[in-house]
Design a protein with these regions (language model features):
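Active-site cores that bind ATP or allylic diphosphates and position pyrophosphate for catalysis
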Residues: 22-25, 30-176, 185
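Short glycine-enriched loop/turn motifs at secondary-structure junctions
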Residues: 2-3, 130, 182-183
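A glycine-rich helix N-cap at a beta->alpha junction
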Residues: 1-8, 31
Length: 271
């Protein structure tokens, strides 16, 4: 449900296509008929030559389908690429990190050969149509932000505020993933008997400074009242389950007899 449905991208293909067509008509995007084999060979040739150049070489830019079909490496099923200008602005203001400068993007694919949009196109269209004014996501998306700002600008839309959160790390500093760490799955915490408030408090501690020494247990209301984007730590916080165990114990001991009994029965029923 909800006022902005449908929410599955596969059910919104007719929503995305008009915006892709507009970008093509305005000269901000173009069809690319290069085959996967041709693109793979391009990457291999550059690697062999130790070329610093990366990204697509714009072979199809300015060509019609008929013109491109006469050249090697052609496919009947094109993708659509955004045409990134040479003078693209690479800097943007981040709510957490201040002014950030990202690498220069290449001509990103925004519509795949099967008619599905890539993340870059879909997220911009969806966020705009759903009224999102603040985008909060992981720091791995910093490099994509100039592309997204371009798409917002080309489509005549208000650019949202961006906040790029630090990624949670395992104890060995590697990125947390579902394959390596069961704790990457939200329902795992419920299955293990962690209380929601304990988990919320734990996540606060990972990226936000505590009130003071010995004041690690904090209500959500207190946290919201003192929240400031600029205070979020940018270093990759380590996911320490021992700290979560301790916090869970604090919250369990603060439960009244009836609440504790209810929680125990809920946990047993799920076993």
């Amino acid at each position: 449900g909800g006022p902005h449905g449908p929410y599955k991208q596969s059910e919104r293909l007719d929503t995305y296509r008009p915006y892709v067509d507009k970008l093509i008509e305005d000269g901000h995007a173009y069809y690319c008929w290069c085959s996967q084999e041709r693109l793979a060979q391009l990457r291999a040739d550059r690697a062999a030559a130790k070329s610093p150049q990366t990204g697509y070489d714009r072979m199809c830019l300015g060509m019609t389908k008929e013109e491109r079909a006469k050249l090697p490496g052609f496919t009947e099923n094109p993708v659509v690429r955004m045409r990134v200008p040479d003078d693209v602005e690479l800097g943007f203001d981040d709510l957490i990190r201040g002014h950030v400068r990202a690498p220069r993007p290449d001509d990103q694919v925004i519509l795949k050969a099967d008619g599905f949009p890539t993340y870059h196109m879909a997220v911009v269209v969806d966020d705009h149509l759903m009224g999102i004014d603040t985008v909060v996501r992981g720091e791995e998306w910093i490099s994509s932000t100039p592309k997204h700002i371009l798409l917002y600008t080309w489509l005549g839309w208000q650019v949202p505020r961006f906040a790029h959160m630090p990624l949670l790390r395992n104890s060995d500093k590697s990125k947390i993933s579902k394959r390596k760490n069961p704790a990457a799955r939200l329902m795992w915490f419920r299955e293990q008997g962690y209380l929601p408030d304990a988990l919320r408090n734990f996540l606060q501690l990972l990226a936000y400074p505590i009130l003071g020494k010995g004041q690690e247990v904090e209500s959500f209301e207190s946290f919201v009242a003192r929240f400031d984007w600029a205070d979020i730590a940018t270093g990759g916080p380590v996911f320490d389950l021992k700290k979560l165990d301790w916090l869970n114990g604090q919250y369990i001991r603060n439960l009244g007899p009836e609440a504790l009994t209810s929680r125990v029965f809920e946990y047993v029923d799920r076993m």
